[in-house]
């Protein structure tokens, strides 16, 4: 039985898979809903992904899977906090699927499922992401559905 910490969050978003993919991968979008953080990469497997906040690199990770516009996975290792530096990278995966469980009259709907896993048992990062992901994903959803993100600061 696997007892490692794992975070799973699903939400429905009134958008298309392509628009959601763009929001996850375009720094012009990520800075709007991720507290000013730009995610920069060419989004190819094995490539570097850099998280930049206020001009500083706060993550330097690797793309593990990239299947536009359906699946994105990368390593996750925060660099901005001393207490996290000794912890090995974890893994975050974004699965995007068209949702057909409700009427399509309002337009396309996708289901986004974020899975964040591969944490050590005594992870200091895990409790932080459990608080952070709901904020980020709620802001992403709001941006895609209304055109304006929820503003917050780290």
Regions found by a protein language model. Name each.
Residues 1-40:
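Hydrophobic ligand-binding cavity/cleft-lining segments
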Residues 4, 33-34, 42-44, 56, ...:
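Short solvent-exposed loop/turn micro-motifs enriched in small/polar/acidic residues
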Residues 4-10, 48, 58, 71, ...:
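Intrinsic-disorder/low-complexity, polar/charged segments enriched in Ser/Thr/Lys/Arg/Asp/Glu/Gln
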Residues 8-14, 50-52, 62, 95:
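Generic structural detector for well-ordered beta-strands
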Residues 20-21, 30, 49, 63, ...:
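Hydrophobic pocket/interface hotspot
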Residues 33, 139, 143-146:
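Amphipathic, soluble alpha-helical interaction motifs
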Residues 41-80:
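Glycine-rich portal/gate segments that line the openings of hydrophobic small-molecule binding cavities
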Residues 81-134, 140, 151-154:
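Beta-strand/loop substructures that line and gate deep hydrophobic ligand-binding cavities in soluble
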């Amino acid at each position: 039985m696997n007892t490692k910490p794992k975070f799973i969050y699903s939400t429905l978003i009134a958008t298309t898979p392509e628009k959601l993919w763009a929001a996850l991968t375009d720094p012009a979008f990520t800075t709007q809903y991720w507290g000013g953080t730009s995610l920069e990469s060419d989004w190819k497997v094995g490539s570097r992904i850099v998280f930049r906040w206020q001009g500083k690199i706060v993550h330097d990770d690797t793309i593990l899977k990239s299947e536009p516009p359906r699946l994105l996975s990368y390593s996750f290792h925060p660099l901005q906090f001393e207490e996290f530096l000794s912890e090995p990278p974890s893994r975050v995966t974004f699965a995007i699927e068209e949702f057909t469980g409700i009427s399509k009259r309002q337009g396309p709907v996708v289901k986004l499922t974020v899975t964040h896993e591969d944490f050590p048992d005594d992870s200091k990062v895990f409790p932080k992401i459990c608080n952070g992901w709901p904020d980020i994903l709620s802001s992403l959803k709001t941006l895609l559905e209304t055109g304006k993100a929820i503003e917050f600061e780290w």
